[in-house]
Design a protein with these regions (language model features):
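Conserved ABC ATPase signature
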Residues: 48, 89-93
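A short, proline-enriched helix->beta-strand linker immediately N-terminal to the Walker B motif
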Residues: 108-112, 141
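ABC ATPase "signature
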Residues: 172-173
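Conserved ABC ATPase "signature" region
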Residues: 56, 60, 67-85
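Helix-to-loop junction immediately C-terminal to a conserved catalytic motif
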Residues: 8
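Catalytic Walker B motif of ABC-type/P-loop ATPase nucleotide-binding domains
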Residues: 114-117
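Helical segment within the ABC ATPase nucleotide-binding domain
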Residues: 128-140
């Protein structure tokens, strides 16, 4: 979560700098913000607004015309199957639906990079798998950086995985590469081995 906040210019690093798309998060935050969309761990939906009003709010922040706003809401409603809940208060939706709306809101500005911070935290198994399908539908269209504590989720969704401990990036690679590094065929076992070793590789 702290890394996501630094990458999205919400928190400044205590030292050093981060480049996103070639822009500095500390010196050029406005340029970075134009490149990214963020669905935070605490969903960004306004609970007292309808789903449609939430989407309209973000379109307004980006100064979309009425026509572009309507077009964008139609597009996202189809992409995220929101048609049946557009008029419902966001706060009355399940956690899975709220997360889906939050991701749709993050995509309104058509970012190049989407940050998903613990997207399925607190969801039941069915809602989690449904959201996985939503995230899979975005692959190939946009760069997604996702944080998770669920090994199964990382394995199911990621092309490349970075393993972190106490703010230190220990290893980066595909599931197969990380398994080979740890000498196992099981990713959860590989994760435990790499974290216990606590050595950057």
């Amino acid at each position: 979560t702290t890394i996501i906040k630094m990458l999205s210019c919400l928190t400044k690093p205590t030292s050093g700098d981060i480049l996103v798309g070639g822009y500095s998060t500390t010196k050029e935050p406005e340029q970075v913000k134009r490149l990214i969309g963020v669905s935070p761990q605490e969903t960004a939906v306004a609970p007292n607004l309808s789903v449609k009003e939430n989407l309209e709010l973000i379109c307004g922040i980006h100064s979309f015309s009425k026509g572009k706003t309507e077009e964008k809401i139609r597009e996202l409603s189809g992409q995220f199957a929101l048609d049946t809940v557009l008029k419902r208060k966001a706060g009355k939706l399940s956690g899975g639906w709220q997360r889906r709306v939050s991701i749709a809101m993050a995509l309104i500005s058509e970012p190049q990079i989407l940050f998903l911070d613990e997207p399925t935290l607190g969801l039941d198994v069915i809602a989690r798998h449904e959201l996985w399908e939503t995230i899979r539908s975005l692959k190939g269209k946009i760069t997604i950086i996702l944080t998770t504590h669920y090994m199964e989720e990382a394995e199911a969704l990621s092309d490349r995985i970075g393993i972190m401990k106490s703010g230190k990036l220990l290893a980066v690679g595909t599931v197969e590469e990380l398994n080979a590094l740890a000498g196992t065929n099981d990713f959860e076992t590989a994760f435990v081995s790499i974290v216990k070793e606590d050595t950057v590789v």
